[in-house]
């Protein structure tokens, strides 16, 4: 049903329209997407006729800044923070609404000689400003269009249009698949685009490395920063870097302040952290990644709010969902990049979570063995662990 990102890029370079599908837990919709440079009157008319949604022009911050395209509102209350600017028409257009005139306005946005005064406001083209960092910062169609344009070697600008059914309802994946087949279009997901970007773009910088004696032995600690969100991550390493081709014992541990530092009994994070360090030290060779993904990615304060809901009878999954989050928001692309930087090619992964295995293998790393890391349950965390086993698929035994 979905095509590889590489095939979609080739189609875009040829001037074709593709379909980009959002995550089912976000807007769960599909947009027609084309490169702005290929937004001919025929492409605009195709989107208007078969998409029926609003035709918008996602732009990089640089292009929007050069043309003084300011936000439509001072206080954006849209649930997805879609960054509309004031709508525009080129001053040489008449009504600005025809496919020919909308195409003309879009092409003028790409002209490096265009200036702000070349456009009148409001108009019939709706520019959108993509966030710096693209889909790795915000998983929206705006960012997807700009990321795809840049991946094609084009300017950071695209054209998008939401796809609606003939009855006016939003087209979902089954209908989108029919539309793609009918018009012979490539169809991709933003999720796959995120994975593609993690694989082709180096987003971590090794900032420092030091020797750290611990209760478990002496480790070499490497500090990394993420270019997209500025978060800082650590790698505790025992053994020589870069590693050779032999499988390395690896633990990917997400930050848990309450468990790691304050010995909370609500989870098993602290004991898992210590057990992993001990096992790596015993083996004499390995890596523990400490990723800043507190609360399975929802952050410390939201994790505490989830705890409060658990006190009212929710389990850990239900609490996340009640707060508007997925059960697990963690992404392992940054971790995979750190492991690659350390020369890890093959690993034995310390985990009870099969999704973590799939997450790392999705970024081209080889996992030869899963090494269980089950801690003894307590009266305080037994239900939590049972929920992870039943609802999140963790491989635990009681």
Curated annotation (Swiss-Prot):
Region GTP cyclohydrolase II, annotated ranges: 200-398
UniProt cofactor note: Binds 2 divalent metal cations per subunit. Magnesium or manganese. Binds 1 zinc ion per subunit.
Binding residues for Mg(2+) 2: 27, 141
Catalytic residues in the record: 328, 330
Reaction catalysis annotation: D-ribulose 5-phosphate = (2S)-2-hydroxy-3-oxobutyl phosphate + formate + H(+); GTP + 4 H2O = 2,5-diamino-6-hydroxy-4-(5-phosphoribosylamino)-pyrimidine + formate + 2 phosphate + 3 H(+)
Keywords per UniProt: GTP-binding, Hydrolase, Lyase, Magnesium, Manganese, Metal-binding, Multifunctional enzyme, Nucleotide-binding, Riboflavin biosynthesis, Zinc
GO cellular component: cytosol
Binding site for D-ribulose 5-phosphate: 26-27, 31, 138-142, 162
Location of region: DHBP synthase: 1-199
Function: Catalyzes the conversion of D-ribulose 5-phosphate to formate and 3,4-dihydroxy-2-butanone 4-phosphate. Catalyzes the conversion of GTP to 2,5-diamino-6-ribosylamino-4(3H)-pyrimidinone 5'-phosphate (DARP), formate and pyrophosphate.
Protein name: Riboflavin biosynthesis protein RibBA
Gene giving rise to this polypeptide: ribBA
């Amino acid at each position: 049903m979905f095509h590889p990102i590489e095939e979609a890029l080739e189609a875009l370079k040829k001037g074709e329209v593709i379909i980009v599908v959002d995550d089912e837990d976000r807007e769960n919709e599909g947009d027609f997407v084309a490169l702005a440079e290929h937004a001919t009157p025929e492409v605009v008319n195709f989107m208007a006729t078969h998409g029926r949604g609003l035709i918008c022009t996602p732009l990089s911050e640089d292009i929007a800044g050069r043309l003084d395209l300011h936000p439509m509102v001072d206080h954006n209350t849209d649930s997805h923070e879609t960054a509309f600017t004031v709508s525009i028409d080129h001053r040489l257009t008449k009504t600005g609404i025809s496919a020919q005139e909308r195409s003309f306005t879009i092409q003028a946005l790409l002209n490096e000689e265009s200036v702000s005064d070349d456009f009148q406001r409001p108009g019939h083209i709706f520019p959108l400003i993509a966030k710096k960092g693209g889909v790795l910062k915000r998983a929206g169609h705006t960012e997807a269009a700009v990321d795809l344009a840049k991946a094609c070697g084009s300017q950071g600008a695209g054209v998008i249009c939401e796809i609606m059914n003939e009855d006016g309802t939003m087209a979902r994946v089954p209908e989108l698949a029919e539309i793609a087949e009918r018009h012979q279009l490539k169809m991709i997901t933003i999720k796959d685009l995120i994975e593609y970007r993690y694989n082709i773009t180096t987003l971590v910088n090794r900032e420092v490395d030091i020797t750290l004696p611990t209760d478990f032995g002496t480790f070499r600690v490497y500090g990394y920063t993420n270019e997209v969100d500025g978060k800082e991550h650590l790698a505790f390493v025992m053994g020589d870097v870069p590693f050779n081709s032999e499988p390395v014992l690896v633990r990917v541990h997400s930050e848990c302040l309450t468990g790691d530092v304050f010995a909370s009994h609500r989870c098993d994070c602290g004991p898992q952290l210590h057990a992993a360090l001990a096992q790596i030290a015993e083996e004499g060779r390995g890596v523990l990644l400490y990723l800043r993904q507190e609360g399975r990615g929802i952050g410390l304060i939201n994790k505490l709010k989830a705890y409060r809901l658990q006190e009212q009878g929710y389990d850990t999954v239900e609490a996340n969902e009640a707060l508007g989050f997925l059960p697990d928001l963690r992404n392992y692309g940054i971790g995979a990049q750190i492991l690659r930087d350390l020369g890890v090619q093959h690993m034995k992964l310390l985990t009870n979570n099969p999704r973590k295995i799939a997450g790392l293998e999705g970024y081209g790393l080889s996992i030869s063995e899963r090494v269980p890391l089950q801690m003894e349950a307590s009266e305080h965390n037994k239900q939590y662990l049972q929920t992870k086993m039943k609802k999140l698929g963790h491989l635990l035994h009681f």
